[in-house]
């Protein structure tokens, strides 16, 4: 029965419970497991930690046979409890897991039977290790760090934001994790932002339990490091080098690493060169001609290995090649540093907000309330091409 100022205010009528065995509704182990699988629930709201057990439960119910009881809300379906929860924090679990609902491409579901280049090079923890070793990158040219300041809130991914993670049909977010065969959109990446992007948060707005101070590196710091590899085939080495050899006309590609990628931090340019080691020569001579250690290293061209990988790509079927080209196009759009020079770039790639109910203009502004209204994200190419040439 609705009442009060808003539809969120309700009156409830409570009746004495019927504890007789004939009135009980079974709860399956699967439903209980779904409830326990909620990893983001506050521990203080966990029904299983609030329950009465043993003698306390028997006294509460008035039945010596009862050893567990906890008041809760529930939904009955086909004579069984379909889901249960706690007051305003009631959560209805999705009926599918990510793998069972058709959200993953078949190739990923059958990944255990397929070894791709990522598996072959980086390893698969259950079966074999990586053939790469990432060394620490050492600071070579320092520009210092920014003064410590509270950053804009850096939240974790929220599964309930299905409009961001699942492909939607049209402009409305009608497909969620309970929708069968609603595919995941792809890999999550963040747009680059100009060096003056406002990552700081007003100190009057920070929350102790959410926000903290950070000290980002200033632009222009230079680091040097190595990625060591061993026993890679020409094609595998070409696949690895492809990451550092992405190129396109009129583009300057940068990558994203570290914390704060969503608030404009973490953009880096990588200048790579290939150095090969002749191990046999290294064993033959201890010292080099200049008297130093014989490292048996020589700088080599990447072209031979890149061509070996490109030749494999050229053998893809029409559908697979179209999918590969589409992913490469999206990647180039997302990594292009020159995009920050486009007109209205910061406005077109800004963080979505909930809007402020305290501000009448914001409370009804669909643009400001994009996140609350479950605005469906455009594709990377749509965002990039909108400002092309501006």
Regions found by a protein language model. Give the residues of each.
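Basic, Gly/Ser/Thr-rich N-terminal segments that form RNA-phosphate-binding interfaces in CRISPR RAMP
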Residues: 1-390
């Amino acid at each position: 029965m609705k009442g009060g100022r808003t539809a969120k205010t309700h009156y409830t009528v409570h009746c004495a419970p019927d504890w007789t065995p004939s009135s009980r509704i079974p709860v399956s182990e699967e439903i209980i497991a779904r409830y326990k699988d909620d990893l983001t629930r506050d521990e203080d709201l966990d029904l299983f930690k609030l329950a009465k057990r043993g003698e306390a439960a028997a006294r509460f119910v008035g039945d010596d046979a009862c050893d567990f009881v906890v008041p809760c809300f529930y939904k009955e379906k086909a004579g069984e409890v379909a889901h249960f929860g706690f007051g305003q924090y009631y959560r209805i679990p999705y009926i599918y897991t990510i793998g069972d609902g058709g959200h993953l491409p078949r190739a990923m579901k059958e990944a255990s039977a397929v070894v791709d280049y990522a598996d072959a090079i980086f390893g698969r923890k259950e079966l074999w290790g990586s053939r790469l070793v990432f060394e620490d990158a050492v600071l070579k040219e320092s520009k210092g760090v920014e003064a410590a300041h509270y950053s804009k809130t850096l939240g974790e991914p929220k599964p309930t934001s299905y409009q961001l993670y699942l492909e939607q049909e049209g402009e409305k977010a009608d497909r969620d994790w309970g929708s069968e065969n609603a595919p995941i959109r792809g890999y999550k990446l963040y747009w680059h932002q100009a060096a003056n992007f406002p990552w700081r948060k007003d100190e009057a707005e920070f929350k102790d339990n959410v926000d903290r101070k950070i000290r980002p590196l200033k632009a222009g710091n230079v680091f040097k490091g190595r990625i060591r590899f061993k026993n890679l085939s020409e094609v595998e080495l070409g696949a690895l080098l492809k990451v550092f050899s992405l190129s396109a006309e009129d583009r300057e590609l940068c990558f994203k690493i570290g914390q704060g990628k969503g608030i404009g931090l973490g953009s880096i340019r990588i200048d790579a060169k290939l150095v090969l080691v002749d191990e046999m020569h290294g064993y033959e001579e201890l010292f080099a001609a200049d008297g130093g250690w014989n490292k048996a290293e020589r700088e080599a061209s990447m072209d031979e290995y890149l061509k070996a990988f490109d030749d494999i790509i050229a053998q893809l079927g029409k559908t697979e090649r179209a999918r590969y080209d589409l992913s490469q196009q999206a990647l180039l759009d997302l990594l292009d540093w020159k995009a920050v020079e486009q007109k209205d770039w910061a406005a077109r790639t800004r963080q979505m907000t909930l809007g402020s109910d305290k501000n009448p203009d914001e409370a009804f502004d669909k643009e400001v309330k994009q996140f609350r209204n479950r605005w469906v994200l455009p594709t990377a190419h749509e965002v990039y091409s909108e400002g092309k040439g501006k």
